[in-house]
Amino acid sequence: MAKEKYDRSKPHVNIGTIGHVDHGKTTLTAAITTVLARRLPSSVNQPKDYASIDAAPEERERAGITINTAHVEYETATRHYAHIDAPGHADYVKNMITGAAQMDGAILVVASTDGPMPQTREHILLSRQVGVKHLIVFMNKVDLVDDEELLELVEMEIRDLLSEYDFPGDDLPVIQGSALKALEGDTKFEDIIMELMDTVDSYIPEPERDTDKPLLLPVEDVFSITGRGTVASGRIDRGTVRVNDEIEIVGIKEETKKAVVTGVEMFRKQLDEGLAGDNVGILLRGVQRDEIERGQVIAKPGSINPHTKFKGEVYILSKDEGGRHTPFFNNYRPQFYFRTTDVTGSIELPAGTEMVMPGDNVTINVELIHPIAVEQGTTFSIREGGRTVGSGIVSEIEA
């Protein structure tokens, strides 16, 4: 039996549930799938109960780190969603920092019985650092709170916390409901789940497609073809490339070099254009073999710049994950692996942080010995003698 064809007619959006342990993230995920299956039956909308989401996380490898996540899919009248729910707090942290699950937006689940808790704060901070710009709040377990004023207080507290981390705390949507009651079939609470999904549909913008973004192609290999010029090969990260396009070669060297594309090839065949995801060879006019190397990127002119200093949000592998056995201190100098190459850099720890233990996550300042094409949201690994000891994401460019 052939698998059903993936329907591209609806825009696809990636979302997830975030929030403190036991506030109801997985129950809400189950409630969304179940209520949508009841209200908008389709081959995509299949009810998933708590146990099936909780018990069957997939182990994903990303940058040498194992991450457990549960994925469900569902659709509303206007969109198709992939929804990610990570079982443990450490899985969330790793997931967000490694970019394993890129979320276009997220539902922050807060139990009305507790209000914001330490991991609520941490997940909001992580969302800010890794560039999840759109959060919707679901105040869960409202059926267990009799006092209307208490609910108002909790909502105010959540909004203040979001504003503290530069989210539009006063304006973003807050939905009050009960995931468990909705799962049990209480129509009042089912209606609230539908209201939540309408809000997700309207509040989280449709993501820009990778092909619409400016060209970025990390160079993996370089060779010269006698009489034709220099070819750089790699997988197009985003954007498109066509013959006669003007491009820039960015990173590692002090000077950014401009060139013109004279040919695009894939599997030895000429292409009119290469698209995001394609493995291509790009023939470049006016570029000598020694003027381009692995670790640089080919990019749309002006779209990305080389930098040596940035702030990063990093997760340091624990000993059990194959990481370091000992902490590191200020001015630790590992290699930073960006896309296709290692560059040595030094780490400055935040004021008041004396050392970083294996298994910690921390904000660091990095200074690289060579400039690399980076921007907010670029992910990297931290390596020591070829093995991964950490993973991170650029949260702010400094110089």
UniProtKB/Swiss-Prot annotation:
EC number: 3.6.5.3
Assigned GO CC terms: cytosol
Keyword entries, A-Z: Cytoplasm, Elongation factor, GTP-binding, Hydrolase, Magnesium, Metal-binding, Nucleotide-binding, Protein biosynthesis
EC supergroup of this enzyme: hydrolase
Chain positions covered by the region annotation G1: 19-26
Annotated residues for binding of Mg(2+): 26
Domain tr-type G, first and last residues per copy: 10-208
UniProt similarity note: Belongs to the TRAFAC class translation factor GTPase superfamily. Classic translation factor GTPase family. EF-Tu/EF-1A subfamily.
Protein's recorded name: Elongation factor Tu
Organism: Streptococcus pyogenes serotype M12 (strain MGAS2096)
Taxonomic placement: Bacteria, Bacillati, Bacillota, Bacilli, Lactobacillales
This protein's encoding gene: tuf
